[in-house]
Amino acid sequence: MTPVKAIGKFLDQPILTAKINKYIPPVLASGSCVVIGKTLNETPSSERKKEGGKLGIILGSTILSAIFAPKIASKITGRNTSKTLSVIKDENSKLVDTYISEYGKNELSKILEKSKTGLLSPNEISILFNKNKDIGDKLIPPPDNIKAKDIFKEIGWLSIFGAVPVAGGIVGGIAADRIYEKKEWKNKVPDKVNEGIYQYLANIFLCNIGAGIALGILEKLNIKSKMARCIGMVAGILLTGVIGGSVMANYIGNKLINPVIFKDKTEEKRTPELLDLSLHTDDIATVSLLSGLKWIEPSLPILYSISGYRAGIGYRNDKNPKSKHIKVSA
């Protein structure tokens, strides 16, 4: 096994994915503290209590939604939830014990014992697969390239997953304004709803659709190259999400949300910014996940929380220059 493949197998270890999952809530909490701290540092002392309270509600609602989003999406779509660390350790222990009982202790025993509860190094993985690929594949299953026929289930899961933090951000933002902006809160609702629609369509849903369409075309053309699949899905994301999503979100906001729901005929255009275009890290995660790289999955709550946060503060190309909220981009 080459060093590059060994590193890839290292990242594919189910125990690694489960450990990353375990640390996502504290990472989100720490990130929220940084956002609140930086915002309060830039806010006049007389406004800090109000700004801190509003941000706390928005971020709290967004983070809780993001943490529970995988289970909600799995419940709706029927997709299997990720295994917990304890379940993986138990399965690995049974697998190793069965192997040792059948073949006895040998040169792989030390590595196999370690694999029960811990991470194997790339060098240990290389030794394991060179000596016994069968047991290696059972402990570290190879990534599965999702076929076109299964793509809609995966896209459905990703799209619901992304919708939950955005909805949480909107709800948190409205609640925060309702508490701290008693007279003006209703006027701020349209921006939150429209930004939520923009974030969801341009940065999540249509990006997933674009990746899925591209994957379907590649399957139809019988193109198996992982590099070609990756490039194709990125192209689909750029065309449908970054470009098409922005146009569709603006149309819905100006023709439906503002005039019909909020009785406001004012039209505004939310344009993609440089950071919107360059920091589509959640799309990288989408491509990776659709390519079978499960270790990227734990990062989704963090990435989708960014969209939820921006929806919660009603970010609209910073049209309010007095806003002190940090402009995190998705």
Question: Would you name each region that the model predicts?
Answer:
Residues 1-330:
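Glycine-rich, hydrophobic membrane-spanning regions of integral membrane proteins that mediate transport
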